Amino acid sequence: MLILNQRTQQLATDSVALAYDERKRSRLKVTLASGAEAGIFLERGDHLHGGDKLAAEDGSAVVEILAAPEKLIEAIADSPLLFARAAYHLGNRHVPVQILPTENGGKLRFQTDHVLAEMVRGLGCSVSDAEAPFQPESGAYGGGHHHGDESATDLHNPGHGPHRSVPKIHEFKPR
């Protein structure tokens, strides 16, 4: 079994498609597109994004991480104000959200949760089911990618209580 534990920018020799919940895990056994078995071993709190590449410990392979399509809720706001309200209410609940532009307002994608879908519908968004790769925003406590020398934090740890981590300024990078 290949051991994938080093980030790299080298050209990929194989790939694996992972859903968001899988990309959040620091330890994961996967089957690559080639059929080979591999183990992903990352620092705790380190998360993968579609497009990331991991090198095998023995240097024999470079695997590109693909964001697998998954079932999501898509909320479309037809004005900037409605978009801001919907994003605020989802963010206030610490919901991982992918933000996408539209001509008039914006589009929010989040994991399937019918209570949240009804909430944003009640705010005035048009809501539908979608199947797409999910690449949510990292958030204030998630930072960007972690590359070993940076402190690792959990995207779902809002930083409350005595374990509170130092907030990081958002890193807005093209994906």
From Swiss-Prot:
Annotated SUPFAM superfamilies: Urease metallochaperone UreE, C-terminal domain (SSF69737), Urease metallochaperone UreE, N-terminal domain (SSF69287)
Subcellular location: Cytoplasm
Region (Disordered): 134-175
Pfam families xref list: UreE_C (PF05194), UreE_N (PF02814)
This protein's UniProt keywords: Chaperone, Cytoplasm, Nickel, Nickel insertion
Cellular component, GO annotation: cytoplasm
Record GO biological process: protein folding; protein-containing complex assembly; urea metabolic process
Molecular function per GO: nickel cation binding; unfolded protein binding
InterPro entries, per database record: UreE, UreE_C_dom, UreE_N, UreE_N_sf
Role, per record: Involved in urease metallocenter assembly. Binds nickel. Probably functions as a nickel donor during metallocenter assembly.
Family: Belongs to the UreE family.
Protein name, entry field: Urease accessory protein UreE
Organism: Dechloromonas aromatica (strain RCB)
